[in-house]
Amino acid sequence: MKAVILESYVMEGGDLDWSGVKALVPDTTSYVRTAYEEIAPRIGDADIVLLNKCRMDEEILQQCPNLKWVGIIATGTDNLDLEACRRHGVAVANVPGYSTYSVAQMTFSLLLAICQCAERYNRAVKQGCWQLDIPESIGLLPQMELYGKTYGVYGYGSIGRQSARIARAFGMEVLVCTRTVRPEYAADGVEFVDYDTLLRRCDILSLHCPATPQTRGLVNAEALARMKPGAILLNTARGALVDEEAVAAALHSGQLGFYGADAFVTEPLPQESPLRAEPHAILTPHIAWTTREALQNLMDITTRNLRTWLEGNGEHIVNR
């Protein structure tokens, strides 16, 4: 067996390394990063490939006839043509649930940064200001208490559900819009509603679903107009869920109070993005999943996925 790691940077640094994978497949070649045009030549006649953001499509698969297993070092598979992989007899394994707590934590980090104006007040104190003695260059913003607010969750997978638990701990009413309501959700203390109701009633809307043909552009100008004036939108899921131009316009007009995001349509966020100019947009560079604990989970599950496949079973295969 021969393996190729196309994006080793994902799991390097500190005490994280690829030794577990290399112990399973000694003939492993590793590349820090790989551009699209380099993917097929680097895979060559390998049986196994591990990747994160690299694409895997029909064109690449045709050039790699020996490929049998793709391990995506992530949960989402937006960059992979799963049906093409299935046609070519290539199993694809993902890593579900590795960053549930970390991403939910980032969601509330963004929300608390918005509600407490922490970054602005940090600057003020370091400049020698105190309480209401804040210069105009920094600006005094009112803080917001979360208790009693209505928190809307779109998508109720493991991250959405954990986000709802945290919201309830803050004393918020939680509304959920999800495709499937399961019996075990009955004890969660949340109310299940349709999308229109979610938009109209929530003070805070948090997105926790994959980007699919049905959810791309979910939050567009029409949806934003149906939300409460001054509501908060949070996106730690996928950038494609929102129309960023519409979000920037809604921020500029005041219809949307704040936007907190860790995911964007194009990454890195382009210099010309209108979000960069909006003071009420709180943006982080898609790092919610990179806590030390989440990365260790990612490495452990990736290695286990490979081991179980080599043993003839294969965990977390998403294209059977």
Where are these regions (language model features)?
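An anion/phosphate-binding loop that grips the pyrophosphate of nucleotide cofactors and donors
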Residues: 46, 64, 202
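Short beta->alpha connector loops at strand-helix junctions that form conserved
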Residues: 32, 73-74, 90-101, 178
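Rossmann-like adenosine-cofactor binding region
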Residues: 58-61, 179-274
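N-terminal glycine-/charge-rich "phosphate-binding" loop or analogous flexible N-terminal tail
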Residues: 1-46, 175
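Rossmann-like dinucleotide-binding domain for NAD(H)/NADP(H)
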Residues: 92, 230-320
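N-terminal Rossmann-fold NAD(P) dinucleotide-binding loop
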Residues: 160-161
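Phosphate-binding beta-alpha-beta segment of Rossmann-like dinucleotide-binding domains, i.e.
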Residues: 88, 96-150, 184
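Glycine-rich Rossmann-fold phosphate-binding loop(s) that bind the pyrophosphate
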Residues: 156-157
